[in-house]
């Protein structure tokens, strides 16, 4: 039904900028989406705009109404809203006035009430326990670091029948209490700026380190849009049949897992890292006996702590490059089921939530990781590796995002089929991009 609804809209020129589950967000000011019979959109407009001013969403709505009229349908007035600053849809509460998005307000309040009651009673049936944990995960969807507070709660009721009453362990209750304390901070700042500083971290047997470079803002925004996401398979070795999902346990990570990407042809991240120079940020020793996954996580945690200490008045989006596939998956998911990585992510979750810090860890092959040198006692590479940029690196650094860059991004992830395979082509001209001026 969703496909049929989208095709109907596209025949009239609407549903052009579609938000897809687990896919990068559209680049335009207008974001459209369809879930069964609901057609919703979000449009970024200047602060000075009023609900009556025309913008891209005005044109989209007119085309959508024309599409419905063509088949004799009329939207129900009680369920039709337009030009709203604040709205609840797609399972979220969008607060346009303060530019934040969070889980649905009513569900959030109910979840907090249930958790408080559970902490007072200290007993529950397995069915109620699992329902509360499911609600807690939903509330955390717009604040992935909050999931790091939850670990043993996911299996606390496994040994009990659905209607059987049991007493949760102190550790499980403590996890819920910690999670509850941070619920007011579980939202996303939609106006958060991207940091043009791009970091890279690495670890060896004896030390870990971080380096930094500066990239154009338009490139950082595009890399942020293409960042790893929870539930989206990442291709680390370049082959179509060698995919690692971010939900894979970090305990399978090893030095070999970190270097598997070196066997493949150069990725976009490798070419980009080799095309710019880098500066040192920090370096310190780690225990030789420590597992490589936690060694790789430590410099990321240190970086989070340092960024959280910076004074700023709004949220910040930061990119970090790492050759550790378990860490790429764990940081995209917000938590790790591994007993190794979980505690490290939990320690820095408050730093991210309280300071509106959003961090994305992108994969780079070990051979191109600029943070590898300082971990092995060598100088940081301050100049580009090649005197001439590759075609891909030049396109990225110049902001020419075309079929070449898109294909490179797609090759690093397991994405859904393109819209051209699923939907009919869009009829009519694009939405006018000069309706609302700059946004």
Predicted regions and their residues:
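Nucleic-acid-interacting cores, centered on viral/eukaryotic replication and modification enzymes
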Residues: 1-439
């Amino acid at each position: 039904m969703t496909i049929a609804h989208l095709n109907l809209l596209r025949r009239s020129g609407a549903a052009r900028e579609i938000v897809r589950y687990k896919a990068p967000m559209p680049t335009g000011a207008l974001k459209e989406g369809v879930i069964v019979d609901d057609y919703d959109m979000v449009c970024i407009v200047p602060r000075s705009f009023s609900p009556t001013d025309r913008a891209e969403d005005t044109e989209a709505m007119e085309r959508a109404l024309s599409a419905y009229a063509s088949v004799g349908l009329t939207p129900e007035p009680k369920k039709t809203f337009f030009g709203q600053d604040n709205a609840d849809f797609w399972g979220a509460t969008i607060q346009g006035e303060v530019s934040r998005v969070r889980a649905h307000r009513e569900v959030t309040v109910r979840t907090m009430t249930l958790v408080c009651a559970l902490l007072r009673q200290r007993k529950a049936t397995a069915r109620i326990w699992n329902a509360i944990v499911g609600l807690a995960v939903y509330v955390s969807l717009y604040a992935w670091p909050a999931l790091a507070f939850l670990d043993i709660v996911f299996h606390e009721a496994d040994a009990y029948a659905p209607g059987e009453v049991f007493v949760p362990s102190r550790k499980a209750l403590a996890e819920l209490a910690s999670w509850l304390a941070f619920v007011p901070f579980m939202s996303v700042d939609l106006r958060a700026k991207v940091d043009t500083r791009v970091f890279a971290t690495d670890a060896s047997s004896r030390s870990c380190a971080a380096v930094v470079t500066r990239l154009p803002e338009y490139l950082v925004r595009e890399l942020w849009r293409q960042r790893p996401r929870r539930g989206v398979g990442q291709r680390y070795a370049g082959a179509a049949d060698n995919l690692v999902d971010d939900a894979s346990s970090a305990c399978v990570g090893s030095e070999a897992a970190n270097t598997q990407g070196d066997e493949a042809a150069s990725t976009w991240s490798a070419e980009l890292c080799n095309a710019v120079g880098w500066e040192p940020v920090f370096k310190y020793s780690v225990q030789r006996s420590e597992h490589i996954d936690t060694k790789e996580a430590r410099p990321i945690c240190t970086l989070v702590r340092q960024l959280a200490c910076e004074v700023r008045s709004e949220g910040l989006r930061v990119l970090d490059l790492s050759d550790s596939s378990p860490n790429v998956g764990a940081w995209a998911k917000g938590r790790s089921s591994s007993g190794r990585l979980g505690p490290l992510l939990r320690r820095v979750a408050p730093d991210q939530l309280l300071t509106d810090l959003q961090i994305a860890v992108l994969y780079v092959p070990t051979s191109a990781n600029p943070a590898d040198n300082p971990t092995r006692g060598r100088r940081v590479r301050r100049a580009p590796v090649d005197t001439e940029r590759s075609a891909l690196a030049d396109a990225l650094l110049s902001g020419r995002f075309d079929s070449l860059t898109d294909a490179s991004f797609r090759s690093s992830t397991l994405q859904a089929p393109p819209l051209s395979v699923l939907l009919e082509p869009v009829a009519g001209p694009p939405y006018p991009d000069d309706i609302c001026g700059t946004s």
